[in-house]
Regions:
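Flexible beta-alpha connector loops of hexameric P-loop NTPases
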Residues: 146-156, 204-212
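Short loop/helix-cap segments at secondary-structure boundaries that form the rim of catalytic
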Residues: 33-34, 68-76, 141-143, 186-192, ...
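Residue-level signal for inorganic ion chemistry
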Residues: 6, 37, 56, 91, ...
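Conserved nucleotide-sensing/catalytic segment adjacent to the nucleotide-binding pocket
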Residues: 150-179
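Acidic, Mg2+-coordinating active-site environments of NTP-dependent enzymes
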Residues: 71-75, 169, 194-252
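N-terminal leader/targeting and accessory segments in enzymes
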Residues: 1-90, 226
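Walker A (P-loop) phosphate-binding motif
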Residues: 93-139, 145-146
Length: 252
């Protein structure tokens, strides 16, 4: 696959090298570096992928996706983006052949009730004949396979990997939990949700490692409703109007 194919839905600047090179795999973990890989440098809460740019290049990576300057050999392609987390999401979709576009995806967000709601919807859809995948706090379910979950909403690469496996397994629908962290960190960027569901909002997840304040928490929850066709609101929740403010979807 050419690097340019992974970048086709992104705006970017070629700092050195060429976007026409062939790449072997897409990674954002420096420990997985290999010959021909494209490495997406992400600045995280614990470490900054840009610090490992030279190490990854020395292991044979062909290209780096960066937000900051990096010092690597001239034969390594360097592509600069405004937001590498967002880039990883769209590149992952391209890498797996845009599997989300072959599925009807329902996303559930809210402080409480996401897990229960996903299993209820999965059961209802299966009862009327759909084959349904699931991604959530407890596990991902792909056909008969169950994969224990590390995060409520996995990293974008993993999400699209699961979507691709679901398509291969014959699924036509997916129900997934969408956390505020997942939305804030662009893990779900570019996913065409058919339906977004809001359960409720409480004062959890406020702190230095999550959301700086309740306003930020509300704003991040609302991001789901900028990328779905239909939003379903729990109007008994006092914050539902704030969450849906600025929504781009039809709301019921």
């Amino acid at each position: 696959m050419k690097l340019s194919q992974l970048l086709e839905r992104l705006q970017y600047e070629v700092i050195q090298g060429s976007d026409q090179i062939e790449i072997s795999t897409l990674i954002n973990d420096s420990r997985k570096a290999e010959e021909g890989a494209v490495f997406v440098c992400i600045s995280g809460a614990v470490s900054d992928g840009h610090r490992f740019a030279r190490e990854v290049a020395e292991k044979g990576a062909s290209a780096l996706i960066v937000e900051k300057e990096v010092d690597v050999p001239g034969d390594v392609t360097v592509i600069r983006m405004q937001d590498t987390r967002y880039a990883l999401a769209l590149m992952s979709a391209a890498y797996f052949g845009y599997p989300a576009e072959k599925l009807k995806i329902i996303g559930i967000t809210g402080t409480k009730g996401k897990t229960t709601t996903t299993y209820m919807i999965k059961s209802i859809l299966e009862d009327v004949g759909h084959k349904v995948g699931l991604i959530g706090t407890i596990e991902a379910v792909i056909g008969e396979k169950k994969i224990p979950a590390a995060n409520t909403t996995p990293e974008s690469y993993t999400i699209h990997q699961y979507f691709a496996e679901m398509v291969e397994a014959g699924c036509d629908s997916v129900v997934m939990e969408v956390s505020s962290q997942g939305l804030m960190l662009h893990r779900t960027a570019g996913i065409p949700f058919e339906i977004g569901i809001f359960t409720n909002l409480g004062h959890d997840h406020i702190g230095p490692n999550e959301h700086k304040d309740f306003e930020d928490y509300k704003r991040c929850k609302g991001l789901l409703f900028k990328q779905c066709r239909l939003g379903i609101a729990n109007i008994d929740d006092p914050w539902y109007e704030d969450v849906f403010r600025g929504a781009d979807c039809r709301v019921e």
